[in-house]
């Protein structure tokens, strides 16, 4: 039976319409850490690419790229076009009470206007003291095209809150063999030992670690003054 919904999307600097793919192809992309990256073991932890890729963006760079793979960016923003409202909800649960929630909603009330939002929560209390991560990302997007297809407007609002605790590693490897420390959060670490800790998926605070926040608002307006193709 033919699908009743037709949905395509475009990237910000592209004119190519891409059909929305809901199959299991590239299923590994549902995990927030790409297969070419090395990370510290829990979802949301610091990571770096095993494939060399220089930063070619012009301008000053602060050098903080440890958590880049967990951020929403302008470049990856999509503008959808659909004949019906479309929503997608994803929930993933892993060991150590790791969880990831993703929400997407988009709709096109008119053929020349569409809007939607993305949201993602990554929460990983993990096993050791002061190792938890809690990342929140959201994105609002909208685009409009005039009836004569000359005027166009694009709007994107992207926000990221990155929280990642740091414990400096355990004090000694031999403690992992201690039968009295089967609960790994009882193993002492180099930073944050005094923190009362219980693995809790709803724990979002960071006492010792990194908290990075950024907000980007993007508006683009264009007008085509070219002659219509004959």
Feature names for model-found ranges:
Residues 89-93, 119-121, 155-159:
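Transmembrane beta-barrel strands of outer-membrane/channel proteins
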Residues 103-107, 117, 140-144, 219-225:
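Residues on the lipid-exposed face of transmembrane beta-strands in outer-membrane beta-barrel proteins
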Residues 83, 97-101, 134-138, 213-217:
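Residues that define the transmembrane beta-barrel architecture of outer-membrane proteins
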Residues 35-36, 60, 125-137, 141-213:
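Outer-membrane beta-barrel translocator/channel fold
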Residues 82, 110, 146-149, 226-228:
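Outer-membrane beta-barrel channels and translocator barrels
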Residues 87, 115, 151-155, 230:
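Transmembrane beta-strands of outer-membrane beta-barrel proteins
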Residues 1-52:
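Solvent-exposed N-terminal domain segments of exported/luminal and surface proteins
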Residues 60-62, 73-79, 83-104, 126-127:
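Short strand-turn segments of transmembrane beta-barrel domains in outer membranes
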